[in-house]
Structures are given as C-alpha cells and as structure tokens.
C-alpha cells in the first residue's frame, strides 16, 4: 500500500518528534515544515532540520516567518493597541502563520492532510484547527490528542515510544514550558502554575533589575500610516525593527509581566511573559495616536480593538468580522504619521517626545496656559456643557 502524504508542523521538540514515527506507522509519508517566526538561532534551525531527517521525514522545509508575522499580526495588533483582557500581548499568534506555511506546503505536495503536535488541553489546538478549517477542506490529524485518550502521562509515553524505536531524546529537561518567537517569550509550569512568585529561572530575554544599565536608553521610531518604518533614522523592514527593539529594551527589563486570564477552553491560565519590543512599539504608537486622532476616535477605537484581540486570541483569525475590523483600524491610521522618542531607565518605557505634521494643537492654544478665545466664551461653554447635571442638582435639592 502506498503511503499517504501528510504535512506536519514541526518544531523539533518532543511532541512533534513523536509525531513522525507515529504517523509513519499509520501509513503516512511525513513531510515536515518549520516556520521560523523568530524564536531560534541558526544552530537550532540546523538541529531541527537534522532531527526531521533522523526521524525519517520524507522531506523538510524551513520557512522564514518574520515578514508574515509582521504583516499578518504585528501591524494590525499595534493599530488595535490593546492586549487580551487589557494585559496579554498575544505572543503565540505566530500559530496562524505556521498554519499558513503548512497549508502552502500541502498545496505543493497535492495533499489535503495536515498534522500538528498540540495537546487536547490548551489554546493552540483551537487556533490550529479553526485556522485550518477556515482555509479549506482539510483532514486534521492530531497524534498527541489521540494518545491522550489512552495515556495520562503522555510525555513519558512519547519519550519511551521514541527510545524503543532507537531515537534519542534531548537530555536537557526544562523546568518551564517556554514559547519564544519574534513577538516575545511566554513561560508556564512549576511555581507559575502553583500561583507562586516566579523564580529567577522563569526569565527569558529581560534582564533582572541588578543587571540594568545605569545610563538611560533613548530611541526614535518613525511611523507612516501607523506602521513603524525606521529606527533612529534608519529605514528597516518591520520585523527587523521589532527584533532590534527586543534586544535594546530587554536589557532594561521592559515588557515583562505576570498574566492570569481566561483561556479559550474555559480554564484560568497563568504565565510569565516578556515582550520588550512589542510593548515599546505599542507605547510609541499610542503616544502618536493620542496626539493626532480626534477625541471621538480615541474614545471609540479601543472598543473595536478589544473585539479584534478577542477574535485572534480565541482562534477566529480568519473570521470575516476580524477582516471588517481591520478595515476600520487601517482607515484610522491615515494621519498616524510622525516620530516618537522613547526613553527607559529600566522596567518601563515612556514616550517623551512626539513630532507629527498632524498634531491636533490649535494655533494660539496651549492646555492650561493660553488660548485664542475669551473668558466669556469659556464660561458659556462650561454652562452649556454641564447643563444636564446642573438641572438635575437644582431639581433634586
């Protein structure tokens, strides 16, 4: 019987390593795809490719996911300007770009069968499956979910399964579950899951306070229609700007937090996250928006943005409503042009200067200092503006 081609989203970790022989023994020719979304170096990329070959993959491709993650997620996320439940900056949204890479490979191979290594307990399975289903009529195979029906200690089972077939398992044991990409780092497990204070081991990019530089860091970002296009006067692709911001602001411990929130499947989730570049980018963009958008725009946009963030978090990346909201967000950015200077001395980042041809500062008017209207006009405005509250007070004394 000839093997059926299947495309596996592959990371080289235990779960996806297990998937290759598991799928082969069920009649599949396994083609692996690694979408590099910024979480590995050249040495790790080389390991992943060799690991796929060692495990018997029929083919392996590595895809540069940096440009896609910038266009597909970072731009609209910065336009939205909101974290999930007001805090979490959606750091595993690269999953949608991984799905895109896997489906492109499936199209090249002429197969409609896709596999992933998600468990049956987390959010990622929802994001993977909904994204695949939204993009076509594909069969989804999830080996880890399948073995969880029969085995409670799945990782121990996976390790034994590989060892019995002569495949080694990486010796290093991690105290935490870590996700890392261009957007940032998330950590869970250990004392984090026990609702205790995270230990110093629960640290990825962000330097501890004791290691912060003594001199302040100042950088300038240039925006064109809401998109960062230059850093300190040098034009760069967006993904490179974000990578540089990660490096610069991580030294000062910027963008680190502990987040507790509601998962897609209804459980409470607790993680440590680090997003120095993304938080810095959001801070600069928000300062520019505050200066150039109208009062009504700045009031209304967060309501729409929250819905966009919820859709992305919950797996509805390809829902038409998300597309509709993005059209509004893009329209709102037509005047978000200018430069913002950021400064940090450690732990937080502030926008300390804004320059734009669209600043909404009326000529002759400076807040609380001077104005080109008279005292009588100010008194008349106050009287009319507060009329409803004044009448209520008079009637109900």
UniProtKB/Swiss-Prot annotation:
Q: Which family does it belong to?
A: Belongs to the argininosuccinate synthase family. Type 1 subfamily.
Assembly description: Homotetramer.
Key words of the record: Amino-acid biosynthesis, Arginine biosynthesis, ATP-binding, Cytoplasm, Ligase, Nucleotide-binding
Q: What is its main location?
A: cytoplasm
What gene is it encoded by? Answer: argG
Per UniProt, where does ATP bind?
Answer: 9-17, 35, 117
GO molecular function per UniProt: argininosuccinate synthase activity; ATP binding
Entry-linked PANTHER family? ARGININOSUCCINATE SYNTHASE
Q: What is this protein called?
A: Argininosuccinate synthase
Swiss-Prot/TrEMBL GO biological process terms:
argininosuccinate metabolic process; L-arginine biosynthetic process; urea cycle
Pathway of action: Amino-acid biosynthesis; L-arginine biosynthesis; L-arginine from L-ornithine and carbamoyl phosphate: step 2/3
Species this protein is from? Xanthomonas campestris pv. campestris (strain ATCC 33913 / DSM 3586 / NCPPB 528 / LMG 568 / P 25)
SUPFAM superfamilies, sorted:
Adenine nucleotide alpha hydrolases-like, Argininosuccinate synthetase, C-terminal domain
Name of the top EC class for this enzyme: ligase
What's its catalytic activity? Answer: L-citrulline + L-aspartate + ATP = 2-(N(omega)-L-arginino)succinate + AMP + diphosphate + H(+)
Where L-aspartate binds, per the record, is at 119, 123-124
| Pfam families membership | Arginosuc_syn_C, Arginosuc_synth
Q: What is its EC number?
A: 6.3.4.5
> InterPro entries from the xrefs?
Arginosuc_syn_C, Arginosuc_syn_N, Arginosuc_synth, Arginosuc_synth_CS, Arginosuc_synth_type_1_subfam, AS_cat/multimer_dom_body, Rossmann-like_a/b/a_fold
Q: What's a GO cellular component annotated to this UniProt protein?
A: cytoplasm
- Per UniProt, L-citrulline binds at 88, 93, 123, 127
PROSITE patterns in alphabetical order: ARGININOSUCCIN_SYN_1, ARGININOSUCCIN_SYN_2
Q: Where can this protein be found?
A: Cytoplasm
């Amino acid at each position: 019987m000839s093997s059926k081609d299947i495309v596996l989203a592959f990371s080289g970790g235990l779960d996806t390593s297990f998937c290759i022989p598991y799928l082969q023994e069920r009649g599949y020719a396994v083609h692996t795809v690694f979408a590099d979304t910024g979480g590995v170096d050249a040495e790790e990329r080389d390991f992943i490719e060799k690991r796929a070959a060692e495990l018997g993959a029929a083919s392996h491709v590595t895809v540069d996911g940096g440009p896609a993650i910038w266009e597909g997620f970072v731009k609209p996320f910065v336009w939205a300007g909101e974290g999930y439940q007001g805090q979490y900056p959606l750091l595993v949204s690269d999953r949608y770009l991984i799905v895109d890479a896997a489906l492109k490979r499936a199209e090249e191979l002429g197969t409609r069968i896709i596999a992933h290594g998600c468990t049956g307990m987390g959010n990622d399975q929802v994001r993977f499956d909904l994204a695949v289903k939204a993009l076509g009529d594909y069969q989804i195979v999830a080996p880890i979910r399948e073995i969880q029906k029969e085995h409670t200690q799945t990782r121990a089972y996976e390790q034994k399964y590989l060892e019995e077939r002569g495949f080694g398992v990486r010796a290093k044991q991690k105290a935490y579950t870590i996700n890392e990409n261009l957007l940032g780092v998330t950590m869970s497990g250990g004392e984090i899951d026990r609702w205790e204070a995270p230990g110093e081991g629960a640290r990825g990019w962000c330097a501890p306070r004791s290691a912060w530089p003594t001199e302040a860091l100042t950088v300038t970002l240039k925006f064109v229609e809401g998109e960062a296009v230059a850093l300190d006067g040098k034009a760069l692709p967006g993904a490179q700007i974000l990578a540089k911001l990660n490096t610069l602001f991580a030294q000062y411990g910027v963008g680190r937090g502990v987040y507790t929130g509601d998962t897609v499947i209804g459980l409470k989730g607790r993680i440590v996250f680090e997003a120095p570049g993304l938080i810095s980018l959001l801070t600069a963009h928000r300062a520019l928006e505050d200066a150039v958008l109208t009062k009504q725009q700045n009031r209304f946009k967060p309501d729409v943005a929250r819905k966009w963030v919820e859709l992305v978090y919950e797996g509805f990346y390809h829902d038409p409503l998300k597309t509709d909201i993005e059209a509004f967000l893009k329209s709102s950015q037509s005047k978000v042009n200018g430069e913002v200077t950021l400064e940090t001395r450690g732990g937080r980042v502030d926008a300390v200067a804004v320059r734009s041809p669209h600043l909404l500062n009326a000529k002759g008017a400076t807040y609380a200092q001077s104005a080109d209207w008279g005292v009588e006009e100010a008194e008349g405005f106050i009287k009319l503006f507060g009329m409803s509250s004044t009448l209520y007070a008079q009637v109900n004394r």
